[in-house]
Amino acid sequence: IALMLPLSGNLASSGKAVREGFMAAYYQSLQRGYEVPRISIIDTNSAGSLELAYGDALALEAEWVVGPLDKKQVNELAKLQRLPLPTLALNYSDHEAMAKQPDDLFQYGLSAEDEARLIAERAYTQGHRRVLALAPDNSWGKRIYSVFEQHWLSLGGSVAGQQFYKQRKDYNPDIKALLNVDDSQKRYSVIRRLMRESMEFEPRRRQDADWVFLLALPKQGRQIRPMFDFNFAGDLPIYSTSHIFSGKSNRKKDVDLNGIQFTDLPWLLEKSALKQEIEKNHPRAKGGYARLYAMGVDAFRLYPRLKQLSALPHSKIFGVTGDLSMDTEGKIHREMPFAIFNRGRPVAINLDKE
């Protein structure tokens, strides 16, 4: 196996996290007496080009490539008619590049799109039908929201309201606009002018929605969540992607996320001996890079089973990043468990008991 990752340059920290996870799974298999391949590690950043990196892999007598991690390089691969070696890319190509994808290219990563679809399905099975959606006003936020909206509508749900927010210190105007609290206050002002006298008034939020889809990072989420309480919407269930959780428990800060349900990797919600060992040897594995370590673990366990997943359409592998399955284009999709913030801590939800 040639493990092709960026180990220098801008993506070096991410590449090293994936490498450490991959090698930890390798050594665990070795200790258990399983047959393991010889691993050669290639730095895609210093190789000069993807073509040269594959040249190195062939010179090292690799039979498989795991990597690259960089999305631009995965797009390059997807545009080729044939690959020099069968490849498990650790990212997803853009849809435009997918049209003539080579047969021996498989794609696996931590797709936010998968999470958005899962949330739509979870909310629908919980009986919710009309959503209020809040997402960042950038290309990533719009892309993930678009995937969510498409899937939500296909299930039979509807969108009561939607707001894209810019990064700022105060998100109250965005929440008020989404909840139509401003309209309630404007109506009061009109009535008061017409009647020419003061009257008792309590602003109201819109009543045509039964849940909220929130796409936010922890810092924004901690500011946004309390604003729903402040604007008379504390009773609306809020669902979010894994981006709402930093990956490291912080009760003091995350108490502001209480009640938010989110989907995340089993790696972060469950205990395992391998996870404890990785965290002991790599302090960064406890924070923002935790998910990339987990991705490395699953990349090692996934590559020998790709043919099985391809041949058996409904088969799954139970990985540390979720239950993994493959579509007809060779893309790996994940199903993940859900958790809820309770007293500032993420607590796994046992879906079987609901």
Segments (PLM) and residue ranges:
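Short beta-strand segments enriched in small/hydrophobic residues
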Residues: 1-15, 131-133
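Beta-alpha junction/loop-to-helix N-cap segments that form part of ligand/metal-binding clefts
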Residues: 13-18, 32-96
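Short beta-strand elements in bilobed, periplasmic/extracellular small-molecule ligand-binding domains
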Residues: 29-44, 102-106, 153-188
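Structural motif
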Residues: 36-59, 115-118, 168-178, 195-198, ...
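Periplasmic-binding protein-like
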Residues: 58-70, 87-90, 130-136, 160, ...
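Extracytoplasmic ligand/sensor domains, especially the bilobed periplasmic-binding protein
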Residues: 64-163
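Extracellular/periplasmic periplasmic-binding protein-like sensory domains
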Residues: 181-189, 207-209, 225-297
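Segments of small-molecule ligand-sensing domains
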Residues: 281-347
